[in-house]
Amino acid sequence: MESAMTPYVVGFSLDGLVICYLFGVPCMLQEVASAAPFRLGPGTCETDRSTSQTQGSVSWHEIASFLPGRTNKDCRKRWYGTTATKVNKGPWTEEEDERLGKAVQHHGTKWAVVASVVGTRLPDQCSKRWMHALNPEIDHSPWTPEEVVFACSFSPKDFVFLMHAC
């Protein structure tokens, strides 16, 4: 009987490093005592590219708990940024826009689900594309002079109040 593979393991090495293995491949390193921010540049984890076809459920909150200064979103973005070979980073195509529109219509703003339906973009990319370009509820036309005068009549304190009133 084949056992299910644990998608991630976090361990501590003898030399004071936190090592995160995703699907059996070391992909994140962090010195435990380091006060410097945790940064992973290009080429830091070349081996994690080989796991791009692996499926599984990962608790990004749990992984981040072992990496001081990193959030669950940092870890998720690092993973997808280095392993998701099918992720487009250039301009959106008409087909992607159509898939995004249908996915939002069906799933709402559950961006992880929407991104899985779109298939070629990350959740953050889908959210930004929808909110900044495609959402039909947002008026993307140039501001009228009346709108500019109205918007400029508020102080920053008014905006804070309005944001909390919604």
UniProtKB/Swiss-Prot annotation:
Q: One Gene Ontology cellular component annotation?
A: membrane
GO MF, one annotated term: RNA polymerase III type 3 promoter sequence-specific DNA binding
Q: Per the record, what phenotype accompanies loss of this gene's function?
A: Results in the significant down-regulation of cluster A, whereas it exerts no influence on cluster B.
Q: Which residues form a coiled coil?
A: none
Where DNA binds (residue ranges)? 111-134
The Myb-like domain extends over 56-83
Q: Where located? A: Membrane; Nucleus
TM ranges are: 9-29
Q: Which InterPro entries match?
A: Homeodomain-like_sf, Myb-like_DNA-bd, Myb_dom, SANT/Myb
Q: Is Magnesium included in the keywords of this UniProt record?
A: no
Protein purpose: Specific transcriptional regulator for the azasperpyranone A biosynthesis cluster A.
- State the UniProt keywords alphabetically: DNA-binding, Membrane, Nucleus, Transcription, Transcription regulation, Transmembrane, Transmembrane helix
Q: What are its applications?
A: Azasperpyranones display potential anti-cancer activities. Azasperpyranones A, C, D, and F exhibit potent growth-inhibitory activity against the A549, HepG2, HCT-116, and HL-60 cell lines, with IC(50) values of 2.39-14.42 mm, respectively. Moreover, azasperpyranone D significantly inhibits HCT-116 xenograft tumor growth in BALB/c-nu mice. In addition, azasperpyranones A and C can bind with four kinds of therapeutic targets for cancer, eEF2K, FGFR, survivin, and TNF-a.
Q: In which domain of life is the source organism classified?
A: Eukaryota
Q: What is this protein called?
A: Transcriptional regulator ATEG_03638
What turns on this gene?
Expression is induced by the azasperpyranone transcriptional regulator ATEG_07667.
Q: Name one GO biological process term.
A: snRNA transcription by RNA polymerase II
Q: Where is the HTH myb-type domain?
A: 84-138
Q: Which SUPFAM superfamilies match?
A: Homeodomain-like
Is Transcription tagged as a keyword? Answer: yes
What is the membrane topology listed in the Swiss-Prot or TrEMBL record?
Single-pass membrane protein
Xref: Pfam families: Myb_DNA-bind_6, Myb_DNA-binding
